[in-house]
Structure formats: structure tokens, C-alpha cells
From Swiss-Prot:
Glycosylation sites: N194
Protein name as annotated: Sulfate transporter
Ranges where the record places region Disordered: 1-37
Membrane spanning stretches: 113-133, 138-158, 214-234, 237-257, 379-399, 415-435, 453-473, 519-539
Key word Membrane present: yes
This protein's encoding gene: SLC26A2
Basic and acidic residues bias locations: 1-18
Length: 733
């Protein structure tokens, strides 16, 4: 054994004199000079008596953070004019130019063609059905899916996501469309009573109701696309981090109830005004039950038959998706069968069923959005833009991670933004990625974005040739297709027990967002969910977990004594961990929980002062014959510990209030003879702490590990016990 090891063993706690591991307050302290009872622990400099040398790190030189220089440097980099710079800019904005020349035809073409055809077949009935949800004619849903698939092929970086119509966005578009139709006077029920107030708001009479509806829808889509491109340009994609999985899940489920409610009138064949605004779900159900006696029996029977076919087949597709090479396109079969039955059975003429009506072929001339509508729909477009890009970016990143490639979040925002801006000139409404169709696309062998071109070709065939054949298709069939596609969101309730076990807070966020989205409105529900989530984040840091730590045997690791067994508590030392940032919100909680788990220095100090007042007075006669009063302070009971080590590893940052709190805690404890050490401080805590918490010559109060702080506390206590004499100290005035 080396001499160094022998010295360390000689000074180990096991061999120390009894009582050296606990702090015992000096018994003799002058009453009138209580401030001298404070122990300047920082004065115990490292010496050869300490077992472990202190760690000293030299910080990196701080870079020049001059904002003006930073902006100039960025502008110089962005404004460089060269062929390489121009090429990189173009290739970065149009990713298709990068990957298409490298396309492996033999390896990828079969999977891309198969997946594109299947998704296209599924999109035909869904596009027609979701058009009703958006308050549009069926042809506009086909336009939307066609242009979105084609544009994302050019601008997108994800190989697997399917961009097209999404039910939640269609619902939000439909609510804006209904409101603007009512304001413009197209609602015959309310037009007469509001005639005087609508004189200046009526659109050109050459534009009928469906024409004005798509003008409103395309205008909202244009504004939402501009927002998304702006977010990509200014790189504010961080907004999506406030939309947690629990929040998005609750929002989608709540909005699904609203979608389901809006489709009930089609299932029953009722002609009802579409409710919008706060409480629309409840209002719609009231209208349904008031008019239930007007149910069209033919539509009801058709709806039930379609449900009996669609639901079991969808379940079979889900259960046997690993064995099926492609999902059964049951929706297309149902649409074809229902159209044939309606046409040859003359259901519209005989029973008055509601049908899709004329669907034109080809494309309409492009038309600019209504610029006068933009101020009225600008606020509505914000929520639509955020939901659209959040879902698109999250899905693209999820599938990229699954298949081992990378996507550019900002480019995805550009892509989805232009998937809305460009189609808005071609009578389209808002699009985004959709999970259900993306899963189908992936499972059927999709390899690259070429799959989107095949989907667009299928839709183009329908637009040019097949669309008029859906004239006799009942709207009840489209309503059933919409409702059946909501089953994934509505089945989220079965995941709640597992979510509750994992995180109760996330479950509460899910419920609050779901209920507010369903019972109030989709926009207010989203806002409520975001605000409540942020409140929960603050709540988690306001009263975070805090615990005393113990040493794991035969290691230098410390863990919570309330969570693990067989941990060693070091005599005379309390190690405290606070699992949250220390800032103005939780500074009082930090003090209260620290005092509760150790001791309250304010109360101890008060007790010491109270005991000090009980002093022994005795009169003595000096040699000069003058009486003098000598005060003697009674020795206090020794405290259980002499050091508190605060583990700062989980404290991400400090604000001014947090620094003042640490200074106050240190001052209070040192007033009763207990030193406070900080350990495992990250740079964001250590840098402000070094300047505010302690002076320059007190930097040895900050440690890089809890174990280092513990050994310093033991050694400094041993050194102090060596130099501080025991026994009462009588001081006379």
C-alpha cells in the first residue's frame, strides 16, 4: 500500500474520532456578537489534509455575440452570388431535382406504382365525402387531392407521407364557409331578416352558392398557405413543440365528434342548417332530435347497409394487414355498388334521397382568391395553418426515423404551404398529411415520392372521364364513409388506461382538449389545449419532485432515498436534489421543501436566540471594587448535520429570483453553523451562480460532482474539528 493510500485511510471517517462526522456548535459564543457565530466555511482551502483534489476546469473563451456583426455575417452568406450558391438554392427548394436523377427504377418502381394506385383508389370516395364536410361540391375535393399529390412530389422531402384531404381541416374550412355564406345572405332562412345589413356584403349574383363557397374555401387556403411558408422562411417551426401528442390526440378526437355530428343529417336524410360557433355539437343534436320524425327511410337503410359492410371490412384490413399485400378498397366497392343501386333503382325520384348531383369533367379556369375576404378569414387561417404543418412535420419525421432517412422540417413547411397556395388558384381547399392514408401507402410498398405521381394519375383519370358517373351517388353513403374513417380517432379511448399509468398529466391534457374541442368549438378547443398544456408545464415546475439522496454502495452514485432501498446516508451531510429549474414560480416551494426535508434554519435560529436570553447573571467584584456583569451563553444542543449539498444536475437554469433564493438559503443555514454547497451545476447555472451566489474567493463552494462535494464537506469538517477547541468559552464584556 502506498503512503498516499495510508494517509487517506488514516483520515477516513471510520477511523475518525467519535463525533467528528457530526457538526457540534462551539459551546462558547459571545452573546453580544452573534454574527461571529457564522462559520466562514469557504476559508477552508484545499490542503494536503483533503483526500481528493478539487477539479478545476478552464472555461472556453466567450464568442463575440455582437448582434450587428451576426446579422451582417448572415446577410453576406445569404446574398452571395455564384453559380454554386444558385444551384444549391434551387436544388434545396426543389428536392425532386436531387433525388429523381438517382431514382433506382428496378428497385423502386413496382412498390411506388402499387402504393400510388391503391392510395388513389382510396382517395376517390374520400375526396368526394370530405368535400361535403368542407361545405364544397364533390369536384373540388378531387381537385384538392390531385394538386396536393403533384406539388408535394416536387417540393416534399418525405418519401412516405400522403398529402391530401384531412378530415379535421375540412371541418374547420366548412365552419368558415358556413359563416361567410350566412353573412353573404346565401342562407335563405336568415336572408330576409338580415336584408338591410347585407346590402353591401352581397357578392356578385353571377356567383351561386357553391361558387361562393369555394371562393371562401380557396381564400382561407391561400392565407393558411402564406402563413405556413412564412413560418418556414422565418424558421418558426418550434411552434409545433407546443402541440404535444396528448394535445393533438385530444384535439383530433374532440373534432371527430364534431365531424360525426355534422354527418348525422346525411345518414338520416334530414335537411338541417349547419350549426357553427360555440356549442355547435349540442345545437346540431338538438336540431336532429327535433326533426327525427322527418327521417328519410331510404337514406337510413342505405346508411345501415353501408355501415354493415364498411366496419367489418375495415377491421379485417386492420387485423390482417401483415398478411394482405394491399388493403381491400371496400370504400370504392361500396361507392360503385351504391351508385349503381341508386341509378337503376331511381331512389332520388321515388324516395327523395339526397344525391351528389352533377360532377363536371376536366378543370375549371384558375381564379384568384377574393382579396376582400382575407381580413375576415385571416384569424381562422392561423389555427388551420398550425394544425396542418404540425401534423405534416410530425408524420414526416416519424416515418423518416422509422425508415432511416432525414427530412428537412423547414422544407416540409414550404412544401405544405405551397400545396395550399398554388391549388387555391385552382378551386381547392386546405390539405395536409393524413395518417391513415400514409399508413396504407407505407404498407403497400411505397419507396419514394413517385408514388404521389401515380396517385395524381388515378385522380386525373377520374377528373377527366369517370367523375360524371357518380351523379346518382347518395350523400348518405359519403356520410358513412366519413364516419367510418373516424374510428381510429374515436377508438383512442381504449388507450386511456395505459396513458393514465404512464402520465396522468398527459391524460388530463387529452381530456381537457377533447372536451373543449367537442363541446365548445374546434378553434377554441385548440387554444384551450395549448393554454392548458403550458399551464401544466408551469405546474410541473411549480411543485416538482424533490428528495434527499443516499450513496449507492461501492460507487460514487447518489440516488433518491425515497425511491430506492439500501442507500447509505452520510453522517453529518444532507444531499438534496430539486428536479426543476429554480425561478420565480417555485422559489418559495424550493425553500419550503428543503426546510421540510432538512430543518428550518429560521426556526432553529429563533430557538437559539430564545435560549440565549436565559443567561446566567452573576455579580463579581473587580479589584477596583466595581461590580461587573458577565454573560454566559448556554451551549446549544448539537445539530444532526453540518453540511447541505444541493444537487443541481436537474436545475436547468436560474433566474434572478432563483439566485437570490440560493443566497438566502445559504445565509440562513450558515447563521446556525451549516454550510451549503452546490454540486453538478451545468454551465447555465454555474455561470450566473459564480457571479451572484458566491464571491470570487468562494468558488470552492461549487463542485462538479456530488461525491466531490461530500468528500470536501467531510474533510473540511475534520479540519475544522482539529482547529476549533471544544468546551464553553466565557467572554466578558
Amino acid at each position: 500500500m502506498s503512503l498516499k493510500n495510508e494517509e487517506q485511510n488514516d483520515l477516513s471517517p471510520k477511523d475518525s474520532v467519535k463525533g467528528n462526522d457530526q457538526y457540534r456548535a462551539p459551546s462558547g459564543i459571545h452573546l453580544e456578537r452573534e454574527e461571529e457565530s457564522r462559520n466562514d466555511f469557504w476559508q477552508f482551502e484545499p490542503s494536503n489534509l483533503f483526500r481528493h483534489p478539487r477539479i478545476h476546469l478552464e472555461p472556453q473563451e466567450k464568442s463575440d455575440n455582437n448582434f450587428k456583426k451576426f446579422v451582417i455575417k448572415k446577410l453576406e452568406k445569404s446574398c452571395q452570388c455564384s453559380s454554386t450558391k444558385a444551384k444549391n438554392t434551387i436544388f434545396g427548394f426543389l428536392p425532386v431535382l436531387q433525388w429523381l436523377p438517382k431514382y433506382d427504377l428496378k428497385k423502386n418502381i413496382l412498390g411506388d406504382v402499387m402504393s400510388g394506385l391503391i392510395v388513389g383508389i382510396l382517395l376517390v370516395p374520400q375526396s368526394i365525402a370530405y368535400s361535403l364536410l368542407a361545405g364544397q361540391e364533390p369536384i373540388y375535393g378531387l381537385y384538392t387531392s390531385f394538386f396536393a399529390s403533384l406539388i408535394y412530389f416536387i417540393l416534399g422531402t418525405s418519401r412516405h407521407i400522403s398529402v391530401g384531404i384531412f378530415g379535421i381541416l375540412c371541418l374547420m374550412i366548412g365552419e368558415v364557409v358556413d359563416r361567410e355564406l350566412y353573412i353573404a345572405g346565401y342562407d335563405a332562412v336568415h336572408a330576409a331578416s338580415n336584408e338591410s345589413s347585407l346590402v353591401n356584403q352581397m357578392p356578385d349574383k353571377t356567383c351561386d352558392r357553391s361558387c361562393y363557397a369555394i371562393i371562401v374555401g380557396s381564400t382561407v387556403t391561400f392565407v393558411a398557405g402564406v402563413y405556413q411558408v412564412a413560418m418556414g422562411f422565418f424558421q418558426v417551426g418550434f411552434v409545433s413543440v407546443y402541440l404535444s401528442d396528448a394535445l393533438l390526440g385530444g384535439f383530433v378526437t374532440g373534432a371527430s365528434f364534431t365531424i360525426l355530428t355534422s354527418q348525422v343529417k346525411y345518414l338520416l336524410g334530414l335537411s338541417l342548417p349547419r350549426s357553427a360557433g360555440v356549442g355547435s355539437l349540442i345545437t346540431t343534436w338538438i336540431h336532429v332530435f327535433r326533426n327525427i320524425h322527418k327521417t328519410n327511410i331510404c337514406d337510413l337503410i342505405t346508411s345501415l347497409l353501408c355501415l354493415l359492410v364498411l366496419l367489418p371490412t375495415k377491421e379485417l384490413n386492420e387485423r390482417f394487414k401483415s398478411k394482405l399485400k394491399a388493403p381491400i378498397p371496400v370504400e370504392l366497392f361500396v361507392v360503385v355498388a351504391a351508385t349503381l343501386a341508386s341509378h337503376f333503382g331511381k331512389l332520388n325520384e321515388k324516395y327523395g334521397t339526397s344525391i351528389a348531383g352533377h360532377i363536371p369533367t376536366g378543370f375549371m379556369p384558375p381564379e384568384a382568391p377574393d382579396w376582400n375576404l382575407i381580413p375576415r378569414v385571416a384569424i381562422d387561417a392561423i389555427a388551420i395553418a398550425i394544425i396542418g404543418f404540425a401534423i405534416t412535420v410530425s408524420l414526416s419525421e416519424m416515418f423518416a426515423k422509422k425508415h432511416g432517412y432525414t427530412v428537412k422540417a423547414n422544407q416540409e413547411m414550404y412544401a405544405i404551404g405551397f400545396c395550399n397556395i398554388i391549388p387555391s388558384f385552382f378551386h381547392c381547399f386546405t390539405t395536409s398529411a393524413a395518417l391513415a392514408k400514409t399508413l396504407v401507402k407505407e404498407s403497400t410498398g411505397c419507396q419514394t415520392q413517385v408514388s404521389g405521381v401515380m396517385t395524381a394519375l388515378v385522380l386525373l383519370l377520374v377528373l377527366l372521364v369517370i367523375a360524371p358517373l357518380f351523379f346518382s351517388l347518395q350523400k348518405s353513403v359519403l356520410g358513412v364513409i366519413t364516419i367510418v374513417n373516424l374510428r381510429g380517432a374515436l377508438c383512442k379511448f381504449k388507450d386511456l388506461p395505459q396513458m393514465w399509468r404512464i402520465s396522468r398529466m398527459d391524460t388530463v391534457i387529452w381530456f381537457v382538449t377533447m372536451l373543449s374541442s367537442a363541446l365548445i368549438s374546434t378553434e377554441i378547443g385548440l387554444l384551450t389545449g395549448v393554454c392548458f398544456s403550458m399551464f401544466c408545464v408551469i405546474l410541473r415546475t411549480q411543485k416538482p419532485k424533490a428528495s434527499l439522496l443516499g450513496l449507492v454502495e461501492d460507487s460514487e452514485v447518489f440516488e433518491s432515498m425515497s425511491a430506492y432501498k439500501n442507500l447509505q446516508a452520510k453522517s453529518g451531510i444532507k444531499i438534496f436534489r430539486f428536479v426543476a429549474p429554480l425561478y420565480y414560480v417555485n422559489k418559495e416551494y424550493f425553500k419550503s421543501v428543503l426546510y421540510k426535508k432538512t430543518l428550518n434554519p429560521v426556526l432553529v435560529k429563533a430557538a437559539q436566540r430564545k435560549a440565549a436570553k436565559r443567561k446566567i447573571k452573576r455579580e463579581t467584584v473587580t479589584p477596583s471594587g466595581i461590580q461587573d456583569e458577565v454573560s454566559v451563553q448556554l451551549s446549544h444542543d448539537p445539530l444532526e448535520f453540518h453540511t447541505i449539498v444541493i444537487d443541481c444536475s436537474a436545475i436547468q437554469f436560474l433566474d434572478t429570483a432563483g439566485i437570490h433564493t440560493l443566497k438566502e438559503v445559504r445565509r440562513d443555514y450558515e447563521a446556525i453553523g451549516i454550510q451549503v454547497l452546490l454540486a453538478q451545476c451545468n454551465p447555465s447555472v454555474r455561470t450566473p451562480g459564480r457571479g451572484e451566489y458566491c464571491k470570487k474567493d468562494e468558488e470552492n463552494l461549487l463542485f462538479y460532482s456530488v461525491y466531490e462535494a461530500m468528500t470536501f464537506a467531510e474533510d473540511s469538517q475534520n479540519q475544522k474539528e482539529t482547529y476549533v477547541p471544544n468546551g464553553p468559552n466565557f467572554s466578558s464584556d
